[in-house]
């Protein structure tokens, strides 16, 4: 029997008198086939350390621990720590860290792996309400996570992996794909969770690029330009840029010059621009003094 078997999950929750907290976005997976598929997608083996976020009662952790060198599981809910100590008692390669992943000192934590030089992969069932902040926090950290295989709301997975000229494409697509390749591996129906969420989930596989997709003069400015270009999706690039930078004659002259330098039409919408286009635009706007 597995932790994820519905009868085992129910017995564990009943034994510990556990009640779900909406504020933590808790939905526990009760399908062992999907858990095995997650591990297979992440290609976990004895030469890999894993960071898991939100282990719950240890359903995914069990599968990870059977395959990885070591698993470090970050759990924010104090009430789950003794439950994890119970369900994972047979594993000596699991560390449960009772901390918010957004506040944890990850540089220090990863040194606690028995072999900290092994590649690190992030595998997680992320709470819907905080998926994007966690992902961006990890991606932008200086820790060389090799790969992310994460479960999230299907809509967010579609946005992250979206291509230009699609409804899902936006600043989040650009922010992630600048650093990583991103592809939806498979869909997870809402019916395999306790309690069942209101929407389906997706497993997103992201692999870190050897270097960012493009080279830009100023990364912060590049991300700023991409974000502001989608503030009003139906507005033209020109309208979004002037709404942000201003509408004085001097500013408009600089914007016109920058757009011409980047060879981008002011009448285009942000969703039509590739990441490479945004790189050219940001560099050009920087060059003209914006």
Curated annotation (Swiss-Prot):
A cellular component annotation (GO) from this entry: cytosol
Protein residues bound to S-adenosyl-L-methionine: 27, 29, 54, 75, 100, 125
UniProt feature coiled coil, ranges: none
Main location: cytoplasm
Catalytic reaction annotation: adenosine(1518)/adenosine(1519) in 16S rRNA + 4 S-adenosyl-L-methionine = N(6)-dimethyladenosine(1518)/N(6)-dimethyladenosine(1519) in 16S rRNA + 4 S-adenosyl-L-homocysteine + 4 H(+)
Pfam families reported in the protein's UniProt record: RrnaAD
EC nos: 2.1.1.182
GO molecular function: 16S rRNA (adenine(1518)-N(6)/adenine(1519)-N(6))-dimethyltransferase activity; RNA binding
Enzyme class at the top of the EC tree: transferase
Compartments where found: Cytoplasm
Keywords, comma-separated and alphabetical: Cytoplasm, Methyltransferase, RNA-binding, rRNA processing, S-adenosyl-L-methionine, Transferase
Recorded family membership: Belongs to the class I-like SAM-binding methyltransferase superfamily. rRNA adenine N(6)-methyltransferase family. RsmA subfamily.
Role, per record: Specifically dimethylates two adjacent adenosines (A1518 and A1519) in the loop of a conserved hairpin near the 3'-end of 16S rRNA in the 30S particle. May play a critical role in biogenesis of 30S subunits.
Alphabetical list of NCBIfam families matching this protein: ksgA
Protein name, UniProt field: Ribosomal RNA small subunit methyltransferase A
């Amino acid at each position: 029997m597995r932790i994820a078997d519905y009868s085992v999950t129910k017995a564990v929750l009943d034994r510990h008198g556990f009640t779900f907290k909406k504020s933590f976005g808790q939905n526990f997976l009760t399908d062992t086939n999907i858990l095995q598929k997650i591990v297979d997608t992440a290609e976990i083996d004895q030469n890999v350390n894993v960071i898991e976020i939100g282990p719950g009662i240890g359903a995914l952790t069990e599968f990870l621990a059977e395959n990885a060198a070591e698993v470090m599981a970050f759990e924010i809910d104090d009430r789950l720590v003794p439950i994890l100590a119970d369900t994972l008692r047979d594993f000596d390669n699991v560390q449960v860290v009772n901390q918010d992943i957004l506040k944890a000192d990850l540089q220090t934590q990863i040194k606690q792996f028995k072999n900290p030089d092994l590649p690190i992969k992030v595998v997680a069932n992320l709470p819907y309400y905080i998926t994007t902040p966690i992902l961006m926090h990890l991606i932008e950290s200086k820790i060389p996570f090799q790969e992310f295989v994460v479960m999230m709301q299907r809509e967010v997975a579609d946005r992250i992996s979206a291509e230009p000229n699609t409804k899902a494409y936006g600043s989040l697509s650009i922010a992630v794909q600048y650093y990583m390749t991103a592809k939806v591996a498979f869909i997870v129906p809402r019916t395999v969770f306790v309690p069942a969420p209101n929407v389906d989930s997706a497993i997103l596989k992201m692999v870190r690029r050897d270097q960012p997709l493009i080279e830009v003069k100023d990364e912060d400015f590049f991300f700023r330009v991409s974000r502001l270009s989608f503030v009003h999706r139906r507005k033209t690039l020109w309208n979004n840029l002037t709404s942000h930078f201003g509408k004085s004659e001097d500013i408009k002259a600089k914007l016109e010059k920058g757009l011409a330098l980047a060879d981008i039409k002011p009448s285009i919408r942000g969703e039509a621009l590739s990441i490479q286009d945004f790189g050219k635009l940001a560099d050009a706007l920087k060059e003209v003094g914006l």
